[in-house]
C-alpha cells in the first residue's frame, strides 16, 4: 500500500506533464489498482478513526489521475452506448453475483466503477459517482445523486431527488458524509464536505453547505459544516443586521436512536412546533 501511495503522490505532483501518451504502464496499473480497491470497498476515501473522519487525499488524487491517463472507451448496456474514461460498475456482473451481494438495482440506475455498494442496498433510478462509498442496508431513491467520494453510512435513506455533493468538480478538500441511520428528505442538497451525524432526520428541501447557518433552536447556537447526531432539521430563516431574513436550517429537536427506531419519520417532522 505504501508503494501505491508513493506512486500516486509522485505522479500527482507532476500532473501538468502527464497525459495518455507519455504515462508509463507502472503508473497506469497503480492508478487502476486503486480504483479497483475502491470499487470493492477495500479502500475508502474517508473513514472514521477514533471518532474523527479522516480523508485519504492520495485516493482522491488517484481518481483525478485516472481521468488523465485513461482513454475514453465505448461500452454498452444493451439499450444504448456510452463513451467515457470510467466504465460502469455492473457491466460484467452475473445474476449470481447480484444475489450474493443482495443488491437490487432498478433501471436506469447508474454506478461508476470505483464506487462501493454494500450488501442489502437498493438503488432506484439514481446516480452514484466514482469513489463513493455506500454502506449496507441503504436505499438511494429515484433521481438521487451521490457525488464523487461521498460517504454514505448503514441504513441510510436518501429520498427522491436528493443531492449529495462530490469532491472532484468543483474540487473540495473533504467529502460529504452521511453517517449511519440517517434520513435525508426529498430534494435536499448536502454538499461541500458537510457531515450529517448518525440518527439524524433532514426534512424535505433542506440545503446545507459549509456557509449555511445551522441554528440549534434549543441551545440558541449557530453551527457550521456539521449536523450533530440525532438532530431533526428543517428549512428556516434568521434575521440579518439589515432586518432581512436569510436562509438557514433549524435543528428543532434531538432524538436518540431508540426514539428514531420507534417513531415514524413523518411524526417527528409534524411535531416540530411542540
From Swiss-Prot:
GO terms for biological process: diaminopimelate biosynthetic process; lysine biosynthetic process via diaminopimelate. Its main location: cytoplasm. The keyword Lipid biosynthesis does not apply. SUPFAM superfamilies: Trimeric LpxA-like enzymes. Gene3D superfamilies: Hexapeptide repeat proteins, Tetrahydrodipicolinate-N-succinyltransferase, N-terminal domain. It holds the Pfam family Hexapep_2. Keywords: Acyltransferase, Amino-acid biosynthesis, Cytoplasm, Diaminopimelate biosynthesis, Lysine biosynthesis, Repeat, Transferase. Substrate binds at residues 104, 141. GO terms for molecular function: 2,3,4,5-tetrahydropyridine-2,6-dicarboxylate N-succinyltransferase activity. CDD domains: LbH_THP_succinylT. Its EC number is 2.3.1.117. Belongs to the transferase hexapeptide repeat family. Homotrimer. PANTHER family: 2,3,4,5-TETRAHYDROPYRIDINE-2,6-DICARBOXYLATE N-ACETYLTRANSFERASE, ACETYLTRANSFERASE. This is 2,3,4,5-tetrahydropyridine-2,6-dicarboxylate N-succinyltransferase. The lineage of its organism: Bacteria, Pseudomonadati, Pseudomonadota, Gammaproteobacteria, Enterobacterales. The gene is dapD.
